[in-house]
Curated annotation (Swiss-Prot):
Residues 48-71 are annotated as: Disordered. This is Large ribosomal subunit protein eL34. GO terms for cellular component: ribonucleoprotein complex; ribosome. GO terms for molecular function: structural constituent of ribosome. One of its GO terms (biological process) is translation. Keywords: Ribonucleoprotein, Ribosomal protein. It comes from the Archaea. The gene is rpl34e. It comes from Pyrococcus abyssi (strain GE5 / Orsay). The keyword tRNA-binding does not apply.
Length: 91
């Protein structure tokens, strides 16, 4: 095993070959799931992928198509309400 593969930053995947041997394939681990910028809840609609995999996806598959995609729906609604109320008070 190469010294670089001794680190646990590489995921070990055991693969059975057609000859019947079991060999280890080393893969980079997936990044953690995206979280809301305000409350920290996990975000739906954003895939867990390494930058190489994310680059291959179309823009619509990388994030939700709604205002404030970096926020969870609950926080997004709260921010939008605050903005509208601020505009009403100002104007």
């Amino acid at each position: 095993m190469k010294p670089m593969y001794r680190s646990r930053s590489w995921r070990r995947k055991y693969v059975r070959t057609p000859g019947g041997r079991v060999v280890i394939h080393f893969e980079r681990r997936k990044p953690k799931i995206a979280h809301c910028a305000i409350c920290g809840r996990p975000l739906n609609g954003i895939p867990r992928g390494r930058p190489v995999e994310m680059r291959k996806l179309p823009k619509t598959k990388k994030r939700p198509e709604r205002p404030y995609p970096h926020l969870c729906p609950k926080c997004m609604r709260r921010v939008m309400k605050e903005q509208v109320r601020a505009q009403i008070m100002k104007g």
